[in-house]
Amino acid sequence: MLMPVHFLLLLLLLLGGPRTGLPHKFYKAKPIFSCLNTALSEAEKGQWEDASLLSKRSFHYLRSRDASSGEEEEGKEKKTFPISGARGGARGTRYRYVSQAQPRGKPRQDTAKSPHRTKFTLSLDVPTNIMNLLFNIAKAKNLRAQAAANAHLMAQIGRKK
């Protein structure tokens, strides 16, 4: 039962891995993709038998594979807004996905057309934490240096006696 999953992972690793000097030839990959589809279907059949293991580990991907739940989740994540093209009319209308987190009144700007750059701000906690870590490292180095100096002095005292 677990063999198709390992087989699927091996095929995905071989297909998705970087290749040196060889272009991806997808026109010859039909048998490989059919093997992937059969392995995936066998894995989905086997996952129903192992439902107790899946509920313990909280793998939600395989349990929500029916089409209706996938469409509902996709509908919650993204919305489409029509964008009129340069030609106008129905021929020039394109659709762009806008995530739910963006404001509803303003569709987002294209990043290529945006004149100003995105600014990132850090909270003051991040530099404070970094400085605390650097101070702790410096203290530890100082303590190690003092311990080494003390050990050296103790060795000299021991030689003199």
Swiss-Prot record:
Keywords: Amidation, Hormone, Secreted, Signal. The modification Isoleucine amide is found at residue 157. Residues 22-118 form a propeptide. It holds the Pfam family CRF. Residues 64-118 are annotated as: Disordered. The keyword Signal applies. One of its GO terms (biological process) is response to corticosterone. InterPro entries: CRF, Urocortin_II/III. It is found in: Secreted. The keyword Secreted applies. Suppresses food intake, delays gastric emptying and decreases heat-induced edema. Might represent an endogenous ligand for maintaining homeostasis after stress. Binds with high affinity to CRF receptors 2-alpha and 2-beta. This is Urocortin-3. The lineage of its organism: Eukaryota, Metazoa, Chordata, Craniata, Vertebrata. The gene is UCN3.
